[in-house]
Amino acid sequence: EVKLVESGGGLVQPGGSLSLSCATSGFTFIDYYMSWFRQPPGKALEWLGLIRNKGNGYTMEYSASLKGRFTISRDNSQSIVYLHMNTLTAEDSATYYCARVDYGTNYDYWGQGTTLTVSSAKTTAPSVYPLAPVCGDTTGSSVTLGCLVKGYFPEPVTLTWNSGSLSSGVHTFPAVLQSDLYTLSSSVTVTSSTWPSQSITCNVAHPASSTKVDKKIEPRGPTIKPCPPCKCPAPNS
């Protein structure tokens, strides 16, 4: 099985340097070109460059937009390809991907990506808030639970439900950046017979701050239901 796994992302100060790595397995590494891409938040995928195979002398080619700041190298004994980056700016903030080149511009295998944030802002751990409906509002056949992850920096956080065992009915919304802090939310819809009789937990990890938080979704309430409308007595005839 072919695998590509990137690592090395994180928070870097403007003007700093960083090297990303892409560990590969499942194929004869020296026979293939390897390429790097990046995708800034809300923007298109951008090709950065490639390093050719043994038959082509392991030569490199780069996007002109990089202006010589990035270098690609490979360790053939370890089947790893690297991306070395210098003089980083906020515009370099992106998720970086490595890809195997099948032929020409056909990329047949990709990694999952590693995120780089270039900023002078400080690392901040998230606050995690479980969101549950008020008792009495779960009379239908399904119920939607939520999890709010607020005030963290930098990206990314990972959010799962029941440590990943609950994946059906999950909707995780894109993170929003405001005042140098991110906010992210996720919801999961389950049957009313599942919750609250069974435990449901929101699991959040923020690698940059080494934070892991598990929040069990507890029912809110009990609440006082309003009285039925009063009925006026019929007037005396």
From Swiss-Prot:
Q: Where is this region: JH2 segment?
A: 106-120
PROSITE patterns the UniProt entry points to: IG_LIKE (PS50835)
Cysteine disulfide partners in this protein: C22-C98, C147-C202
UniProt keyword terms in alphabetical order: Adaptive immunity, Disulfide bond, Immunity, Immunoglobulin, Repeat, Secreted
List the Gene3D superfamilies: Immunoglobulins (2.60.40.10)
Example of a GO MF term: antigen binding
The protein's superkingdom reads Eukaryota
Q: Which terms does the UniProt entry file under GO BP?
A: immunoglobulin mediated immune response
Cell wall biogenesis/degradation listed as a keyword = no
Q: Where is this region: D segment?
A: 101-105
Respond yes or no to whether keyword Repeat is given for this record.
yes
- SUPFAM superfamilies under this entry? Immunoglobulin (SSF48726)
Q: Where in the cell is it found?
A: Secreted
One Pfam family hit = C1-set
List, for all copies, the residue spans of the domain called Ig-like: 1-119, 126-218
Cellular component, GO, one term = immunoglobulin complex
Functionally, this protein is described as follows: Anti-influenza H3N2 neuraminidase antibody.
Q: What is this protein called?
A: Ig heavy chain Mem5
